[in-house]
Amino acid sequence: MTDNVFDVIVIGGGHAGSEAASAAARLGAKTALITHRRDTIGVMSCNPAIGGLGKGHLVREIDAMDGLMGRVADVAGIQFRMLNKKKGAAVRGPRTQADRKLYRLAMLAAIEATPDLDIIEGDAFDLDVVDGCVAGVIMKDDRTLKAPAVVLTTGTFLRGLIHIGSEKTPAGRVGEAPSIGLSATLARLGLRLGRLKTGTPARLDGKTIDWQSIGRQGADEELIPFSFMTDTITTRQIECGVTRTTEATHRIIVDNIMRSAMYSGQIEGVGPRYCPSIEDKLVKFGERDGHQVFLEPEGLDDDTVYPNGISTSLPAEVQADFIKTIPGLEAARILQPGYAIEYDHVDPRELTPSLEVKRLRGLFLAGQINGTTGYEEAAAQGLAAGLNAALRSSDSDPFHFSRTSSYIGVMIDDLTSRGVTEPYRMFTSRAEYRLSLRADNADMRLTPLAMRVGCVSDARVRRFTSYQAEIETCRALLQSLAVTPNEARRAGLNINLDGQRRTAYDLLSYPNYSFAALSDVWPEKLGMIGPKVAEALEIEAGYSVYLDRQASAIADQQRDEERQIPLDFNYDALAGLSNELKVKLGTARPFNIAQAAIVEGMTPAAIALLLVHLRRLSSAERNSA
């Protein structure tokens, strides 16, 4: 019997499930990962890439918490690039194309090497619920696995339905059956469900592409890893092809637009705004004479090519026709047609910031089930849900990511307070404090928190504390070195002759002075500082003026996040609150004052009233203790 008893059970072995299971096990919870097949753990169902704008920040944050995605991407990455590298550090996004096979095998190896983590092959059919709390998972073969905390990471499998033209196939992804039982379970629990859609392009045979006739894009000269624990990238790097659709392409698609599952009315679900199908592009941006297509090889020893930019749900024969009108693809052979897939999701406002279902203790949701799109968004939620599931299993306080200190916190707050009307994707523009939430400082922001929670390996603790000490020592050195304007001029630094002494740290905040320039002024002092620390301090100093201005706003936000509202708070009993707000707050059930403040119609007076009542409640609880 003890073989079927766990602290945490994770359902689903995709990007959310892998991170959730790993996170729970790292906290010492005896964890089970349920998946249909062991060899599908870590499968990249759509594009063969990790990271990007906003998404790369999430990967770095997952890594800072000792998660898996960054390290696995460093093993499998075959074209590392830093996006927006000519812009400010706050909006730069690390990205890599990935070898699908290498990524899957590296993720499986990482999961198998994790202590306290068992992989169970099978089909989770229902939840075991006792006295309003999760008690385990009921399998399709009638086995019952016991656990006080369960994480659902079902991806596109909840009543998944694939569309290729008018053809409809129940599936979670190509060749894999959907999950019907769990969708019925969620509906039975009274959770608000919706229907969303995503899509993928046809896969092409790289041997049939005319690579000589199209543009090429290669990796950066300097390969920058995702993980703090990766010293160098050793996997061979490759180029991808770049081409464009043509007027002939557009004509075929427009002539057949009503045969697309999206435009025939066959699909109910809403698709991702920022990853549109080629049909959507032509309907919404019909004035353009072409749309860029990136031809991304799916592996070092795989001839399959992913044509990024032409996701579609047109019939297979129409896909074949329009693909042949794209330069370089005139003779391309389709290995698998593109398709749209629609699936059920849960309104994420049903969740607390720990990603626990408000009305069912012990049930956590992560990934596309919460209305997001993308591997990185799913993995970040999996990390949060896995940590909190482990904490729930031991009756410990939950761990909440703040939107002031992480993109993970921004995403979870957006989801749980605002909900979704379309698949949610992370962008740097979603963060109010993005100048301080940079990809380059994810470790400094989050690893100390991870160390306090206890989900970090000894090896990472040693490496991070050494790096942190080096940063602090070098920062203090920069702040101790100072020059007058005349001394600076003699050293070749052109600053105002105002008689004011400036430290090396002050000078580093000027846009026209680099660490290398200051090293010429103080070669003996600064010449020995390594490039990684030098770059970190250069970026930090450059943003220091702006970050000082933001400090007050961040403190206010953190204070409001810390003022929690009981989930059973009786808004109807709050005299002075309008009936409209009583209804809206009762429906939204905000977790804290920060979430209450963004409820539609909320006023400063209503917030003040709520705060007064919460203080009275807190005082009464203290007096009765």
Swiss-Prot record:
Pfam families: GIDA (PF01134), GIDA_C_1st (PF21680), SAM_GIDA_C (PF13932). GO terms for molecular function: flavin adenine dinucleotide binding. Its cofactor is FAD. FAD binds at G12, G13, G14, H15, A16, G17. GO terms for cellular component: cytosol. Gene3D superfamilies: FAD/NAD(P)-binding domain (3.50.50.60), GidA associated domain, C-terminal subdomain (1.10.150.570), tRNA uridine 5-carboxymethylaminomethyl modification enzyme MnmG/GidA (1.10.10.1800). Keywords: Cytoplasm, FAD, Flavoprotein, NAD, tRNA processing. It is found in: Cytoplasm. One of its GO terms (biological process) is tRNA methylation. NCBIfam families: mnmG_gidA. Homodimer. Heterotetramer of two MnmE and two MnmG subunits. Belongs to the MnmG family. NAD-binding protein involved in the addition of a carboxymethylaminomethyl (cmnm) group at the wobble position (U34) of certain tRNAs, forming tRNA-cmnm(5)s(2)U34. This is tRNA uridine 5-carboxymethylaminomethyl modification enzyme MnmG. It comes from Rhizobium johnstonii (strain DSM 114642 / LMG 32736 / 3841).
